[in-house]
């Protein structure tokens, strides 16, 4: 596990710890080692964990003695949900997922569904900030992004990486839909919004907007990382 990267804003209690972990996922029948970004958002008392893909122990080490209020999965692929129950059970926290990703979720957890069905416009509160759910389908039907206006960030899952929309495998890819989600729902956020993706480095909305036309032209061959 890499050391967590911490982000915050002056005058606010809420901060973001980014935990990079790695694990094996299977893409089209082939096993790959993949790094994922898990985010811990909160203050000294309470947190929300976003995209618990690998290594629950590493994430809980960063959480420490703070209460986990919720575990939010931006979509149902295994590298974004695999550690959800191991993290949630410590504080009996609910797990949240968009219902359109239940079929994908059940490939990893066939017998246990999430507790909360997210919907576009839904809100989660933690510390002195809120997360707004933005339904951003394409990578999967139930992909969501989470906008925190107070901190000026959006957790984009695999809807948008610094290198472009994440390439996808599995049963439900919709690249035109993914581009539509990026253009209509993410690139319309304030230009200085920091995009915190499920893999790799961050990017600003303004920087992503400059690359958008090239992603449209490239189509499914746009350079986003291959992801499960």
Where are these regions (language model features)?
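Short Gly/Pro-enriched turn/cap motifs at secondary-structure boundaries
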Residues: 29-31, 115, 135-137
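Short polar/acidic secondary-structure junctions
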Residues: 123, 137-138
């Amino acid at each position: 596990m890499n050391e967590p990267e911490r982000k915050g804003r002056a005058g606010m209690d809420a901060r973001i710890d980014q935990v990079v972990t790695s694990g094996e996922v299977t893409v089209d029948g082939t096993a790959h080692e993949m790094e994922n970004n898990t985010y811990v958002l909160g203050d000294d008392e309470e947190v929300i964990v976003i995209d618990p893909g690998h290594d629950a122990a590493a994430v809980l080490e960063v959480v420490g003695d703070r209460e986990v209020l919720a575990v939010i999965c931006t979509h149902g692929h295994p590298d974004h949900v695999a550690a959800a129950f191991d993290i949630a059970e410590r504080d009996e926290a609910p797990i949240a997922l968009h219902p359109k990703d239940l079929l994908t979720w059940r490939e990893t957890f066939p017998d246990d569904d999430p507790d909360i069905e997210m919907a576009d416009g839904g809100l989660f509160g933690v510390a002195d900030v809120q997360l707004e759910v933005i339904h951003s389908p394409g990578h999967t039907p139930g992909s969501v992004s989470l906008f925190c206006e107070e901190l000026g960030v959006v957790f984009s899952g695999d809807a948008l990486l610094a290198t472009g929309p994440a390439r996808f495998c599995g049963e439900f890819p919709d690249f035109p839909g993914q581009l539509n989600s990026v253009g209509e729902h993410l690139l319309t956020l304030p230009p200085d919004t920091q995009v915190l993706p499920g893999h790799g480095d961050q990017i600003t909305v303004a920087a992503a907007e400059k690359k958008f036309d090239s992603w449209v032209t490239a189509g499914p061959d746009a350079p986003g990382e291959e992801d499960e």
